[in-house]
């Protein structure tokens, strides 16, 4: 196959290798799905010797096909039948429906295994459309009923998004979109580690992202608009998160472990190299962590990367989505049990971002008297308290009761955010730095 995958993949939003220099992008496994459709596992090699594997579904055509934009056009390749054009098949409605039919049939194609969940009904005739919201994966929405998420960068092991959604669906938890199906392969041929490739879930039609709702409330609060309070929704969100935690604990169990002091210290040291602003606070943060050395905490399976962008408000309730865990971590690490307080801390940090992101866009003289900063702080405090109260109403235990542990998880998250902002969005660095100072007191 002479297709220049490397020239195309580096411009995709889901490509994770931008910080490294690409050497080659070559197909490792090619599985024909039909005459004009190939499933491809692409190995991308970098100058540092590392290799990442990406998943593509390629639609072949002898001449240009209307409807495919530049982003969906991979290139041309010379084969036995002459020159052909390759397209990203997820943008082709007929090809997307073919994938859904394979899931519906629980089909096996070579080493590709498709599975429909028991009792699931898939909308085989609904019109498909690629979602514009994804970053690391590609999702195709079928009408108002289902969403096919295709993982782009794939790794061996059990995928936590499929795993936890299956557990929650089987338990009947109403705070997740029901898992309808999935597909996988073997990493290095039959008998080797499994490798998740994608999943189908019920689509949350007419839903709103929690981040959009919270930031809209915060903007209205700054403008003195009546009705800007978000606390009732924060309370219900706390209910939902506690419900998911309770289901996971009951289904998969809990255990007791020491607070992960070494893990958070390693993250602090790494972050300090990216954000010099942390240097003057590193000793105080470390001291906070070391206070918890040897402290026993209850751990279980959790979401692992929870924030307001990972929750959807439907007309009926809150849903938690994307149980993949912390981006960039190996699958085994993402599946490691952790304290439910990590998820709680993620939501609390997200409240701070929702309130303060407007402030960082203002010139200092626009809030010279600190009035807007006070409003932001009050908004965060009110919504954080409502969320924790809602969580406690379902869990029977207020997460603020273990305040020093919760604060440590908030610090860990803020330290990570500081490193990220210093590298990619320096104008937002004051948000996590302000939080670190507040937590340290």
UniProtKB/Swiss-Prot annotation:
Does the UniProt entry include the keyword Nucleotide-binding? yes
The alphabetized UniProt keywords are: ATP-binding, Carbohydrate metabolism, Glycogen biosynthesis, Glycogen metabolism, Kinase, Nucleotide-binding, Transferase
Q: Give the EC number(s) under which this enzyme is classified.
A: 2.7.1.175
**What is catalysed by this protein?**
D-maltose + ATP = alpha-maltose 1-phosphate + ADP + H(+)
What GO molecular function annotations does the UniProt record carry, in alphabetical order? ATP binding; kinase activity
Q: In which pathway does it act?
A: Glycan biosynthesis; glycogen biosynthesis
Pfam families registered for this protein in UniProt = Mak_N_cap
Output the superkingdom of the source species: Bacteria
* Keyword Nucleotide-binding in annotation: yes
Extract the InterPro entries matched here: Kinase-like_dom_sf, Mak_N_cap
Q: Would you kindly state one Gene Ontology biological process term found in this protein's UniProt entry?
A: glycogen biosynthetic process
Record's function text: Catalyzes the ATP-dependent phosphorylation of maltose to maltose 1-phosphate. Is involved in a branched alpha-glucan biosynthetic pathway from trehalose, together with TreS, GlgE and GlgB.
How is the subunit organization of this protein annotated in UniProt? Monomer.
Question: Which protein family is named in the record?
Answer: Belongs to the aminoglycoside phosphotransferase family.
Q: What is this protein called?
A: Maltokinase
Protein source organism: Mycolicibacterium vanbaalenii (strain DSM 7251 / JCM 13017 / BCRC 16820 / KCTC 9966 / NRRL B-24157 / PYR-1) (Mycobacterium vanbaalenii)
């Amino acid at each position: 196959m002479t297709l220049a995958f490397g020239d195309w993949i580096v411009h995709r939003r889901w490509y994770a290798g931008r910080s490294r220099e690409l050497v080659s992008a070559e197909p490792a496994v090619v599985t024909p799905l039909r005459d004009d459709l190939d499933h491809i596992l692409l190995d991308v090699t970098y100058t540092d010797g590392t290799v990442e594997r990406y998943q593509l579904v390629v639609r072949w055509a002898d001449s240009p096909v209307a409807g495919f934009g530049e982003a969906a056009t991979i290139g041309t390749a010379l084969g036995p039948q002459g020159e052909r054009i390759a397209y990203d098949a997820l943008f082709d409605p007929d090809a997307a429906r073919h994938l859904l039919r394979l899931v519906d049939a629980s089909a096996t194609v070579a080493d590709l295994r498709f599975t429909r969940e028991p009792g699931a009904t898939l909308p085989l005739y609904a019109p498909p459309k690629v979602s514009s919201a994804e970053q690391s994966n590609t999702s195709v929405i079928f009408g108002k009923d289902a969403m096919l998420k295709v993982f782009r960068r794939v790794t061996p092991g059990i995928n936590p998004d499929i795993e936890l959604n299956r557990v929650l669906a089987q338990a009947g938890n109403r705070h997740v979109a029901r898992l309808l199906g999935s597909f996988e392969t073997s990493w290095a041929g039959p008998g080797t580690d499994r490798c998740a490739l994608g999943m189908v879930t019920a689509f949350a039609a007419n839903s709103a992202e929690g981040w959009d709702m919270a930031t809209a409330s915060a903007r209205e609060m700054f403008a003195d608009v009546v009705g800007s309070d978000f606390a009732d929704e924060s309370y219900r969100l706390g209910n939902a998160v506690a419900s998911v935690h309770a289901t996971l604990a009951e289904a998969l169990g809990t255990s007791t472990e020491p607070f992960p002091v070494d893990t958070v210290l390693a993250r602090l040291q790494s972050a300090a190299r990216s954000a010099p602003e942390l240097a003057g606070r590193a000793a105080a943060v470390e001291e906070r962590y070391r206070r918890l050395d040897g402290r026993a905490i209850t751990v279980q399976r959790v979401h692992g990367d929870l924030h307001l962008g990972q929750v959807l408000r439907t007309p009926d309730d809150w849903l938690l989505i994307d149980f993949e865990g912390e981006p960039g971590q190996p699958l085994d690490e993402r599946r490691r049990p952790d304290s439910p307080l990590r998820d709680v801390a993620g939501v609390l940090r997200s409240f701070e971002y929702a309130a303060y992101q407007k402030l960082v866009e203002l010139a200092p003289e626009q809030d010279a008297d600190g009035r807007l900063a006070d409003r932001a702080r009050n908004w965060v405090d009110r919504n954080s308290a409502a969320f924790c109260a809602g969580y406690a109403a379902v869990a029977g235990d207020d997460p603020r009761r273990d305040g020093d542990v919760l604060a440590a998880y908030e610090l860990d998250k803020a330290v990570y955010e500081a490193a990220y902002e210093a590298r990619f969005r320096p104008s937002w660095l004051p948000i996590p730095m302000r939080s670190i100072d507040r937590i340290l007191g």
